[in-house]
């Protein structure tokens, strides 16, 4: 049976880093919806948003999400994938959704350490910590609604992977 593990959470929470490590451990394929979007369009998230707006980007993001249907895979999603109720339903119906939760302070620290401005356009135009706190507050309920499992993403990636494995396979951990 095909099994998908969808990683959700705010930008900078570790969806790609943890997702890649988890895929290696499980022997699953790894997919990143932002990367898939770039490969299919030849444009970065910032370029798509500049040309089509957030609505156009979100529509493309949903198309990419539903195209991930073959084989066992860990899928790192964009931070806003949960804004669409259809995306939340799709992920829950097609696999297990893992919410990597981190505080605004931790996310800000990570984003400052590894800036990717061309990949991550501002959503509000506010200073980073304010924007992150505002976006988290607006999305927290949706992340929780989508998730089968919620994990603390402030730990090192290997620890987060171990915690995910313990949640997914509790009998193997004992």
UniProtKB/Swiss-Prot annotation:
It is found in: Cytoplasm. Substrate binds at residues 34, 58, 79, 139. It catalyses: shikimate + ATP = 3-phosphoshikimate + ADP + H(+). Binds 1 Mg(2+) ion per subunit. Residues 112-126 are annotated as: LID domain. GO terms for cellular component: cytosol. Keywords: Amino-acid biosynthesis, Aromatic amino acid biosynthesis, ATP-binding, Cytoplasm, Kinase, Magnesium, Metal-binding, Nucleotide-binding, Transferase. GO terms for biological process: amino acid biosynthetic process; aromatic amino acid family biosynthetic process; chorismate biosynthetic process. Pathway: Metabolic intermediate biosynthesis; chorismate biosynthesis; chorismate from D-erythrose 4-phosphate and phosphoenolpyruvate: step 5/7. GO terms for molecular function: ATP binding; magnesium ion binding; shikimate kinase activity. The keyword Metal-binding applies. Its cofactor is Mg(2+). PROSITE patterns: SHIKIMATE_KINASE. Belongs to the shikimate kinase family. AroL subfamily. Monomer. The LID domain closes over the active site upon ATP binding. PANTHER family: SHIKIMATE KINASE, SHIKIMATE KINASE 2. This is Shikimate kinase 2. The lineage of its organism: Bacteria, Pseudomonadati, Pseudomonadota, Gammaproteobacteria, Enterobacterales.
